[in-house]
Structure formats: C-alpha cells, structure tokens
Amino acid sequence: MQISYFHVPAEMPQSVRPSAAVVIDVLRATTTIAWALHNGAEAIQAFADVDALHTAAAAWPADARLLVGERGGQKLEGFDLGNSPVTVGPETVAGKRLFMSTTNGTRALDRVRDVPLLMTAALPNREAVAQRLHQHKPDTLAIVGSGWEGSYSLEDSLAAGALVHRLLELDSAANAAANDEATAALALWKQWMHDPEACLRTATHGQRLIRIGNHDADFQCCAGLDQLSTVPTQGEPGVLKAA
C-alpha cells in the first residue's frame, strides 16, 4: 500500500487517482459524522455549497431530516444543529438523514468524491478505518486533511499520523510505503499520542473554539481514541453511511 497524506485538499494533484481515500476533519466534521452514524443516523449527505444543501433537503421528508451546518465554528442560522459530536445523540439523529455543510470537512469530501472507496476518519474510529483498509488492501491510499480555510491544521495531521501508525502495524514495512507528509504526521502522532486532547487544544482551530465558547465536551469527544466501530463510507456521491 502506497500511503500519501495531503494536508489540505488543494495539495492533492488532479492527476492523483488513488484506489481509496480517507478524509479527516478532527475538529469537528468527521468526528461528528462518525458519532452520528454510530447513533443511528440513516446517512450523512455532505455539501460544500449551502444552497445545494437546501435544495436537496427540501426533497426529503421534514420529519426524517436534519440540517447540520457550521461556518467559522458557529452553527448556521436556520439549521437544526451545528458541527458538534456531542449534539448528535441517538434521541436526536436516529433514523434521520443529516444534510451537512461545514467550513472545511465537507469541502474536502467534495474533492475526492469520485474515488472508488471513500471513507472518513477521526480519532474515535481510527482503528475501525485502519481495519477496513487492511481488509480491502488498496494499492494507493490518499489521506486528505481538511485544514482550516485552505491552511494546514495540526489536529488533522495528528489523526492522519494515528491512522498511518496503525496501518504500518497491520502491514509490514515491506508492504507499505508513506510519503514525507505521512511520515511527518506519524512523528507528530508519536509526540502527542499519550495526550491527544492537549494537541487539539494547542492547535490553532482548537484555540479558536476555546475563544468562542466552552467546548470541553467537544474536545473530549474528538480526542477519544478507538471508541467506535463505525466506518462512514460513501455509497453514492456525497452520501456517507455506516459500514
């Protein structure tokens, strides 16, 4: 398996066509996606564009849909939920389709929506995603960080490193190779692996969340390692379901 990590979607050349892709947005889209599907959401339908989201959601029964949206860390006006994993409990999301648009994560998903095997990962479902990749054994894997408005984010690289670490444990070094970005992410993970929440709070986006309110529960949820068996997987363009 050739593992390539791209800090942000724009770093991934248009000519790169991997066998599989994993999108990461630790704070907080892919963490929220994993928890929502774990808690019984029917699906997550991701949109880079809010107008397109509203059009698609309007065609869905009102009692079977939720609008989930965030810009700049704040819930979008008129939406049911913001981008917080602690708000997607089973009593809220079970059986419903979540129409979701966020500052960074859903845009990253849009960039790789044509990849044959597309999943999302966060720290809580790191092990489950690693096992699924080990099972499928793609020749080439692109791990795509969401970043923040096109810039590098520490927390996405932390989770990328955590995933690379587990993949290299599952596959011998002779069967796996990583690009420099993935190797650097692995080193970052080894630095913070015993206290990932501290890394999330140190990150620029973590500091941004701290400034706009009390997000202690979000930090704890986003930093929880290997808690979920859910692997959000794209079945049709833009639609993720538990697998």
From Swiss-Prot:
Domain of life the protein comes from: Bacteria
Pfam families linked: 2-ph_phosp
EC number, UniProt record: 3.1.3.71
Single Gene Ontology MF annotation: sulfopyruvate decarboxylase activity
SUPFAM superfamilies (alphabetical): ComB-like
Swiss-Prot/TrEMBL cofactor(s): Mg(2+)
UniProt keywords, alphabetically: Hydrolase, Magnesium
Catalysed conversion reaction: (2R)-O-phospho-3-sulfolactate + H2O = (2R)-3-sulfolactate + phosphate
Entry's family note: Belongs to the ComB family.
Protein name: Probable 2-phosphosulfolactate phosphatase
Origin organism lineage: Bacteria, Bacillati, Cyanobacteriota, Cyanophyceae, Synechococcales
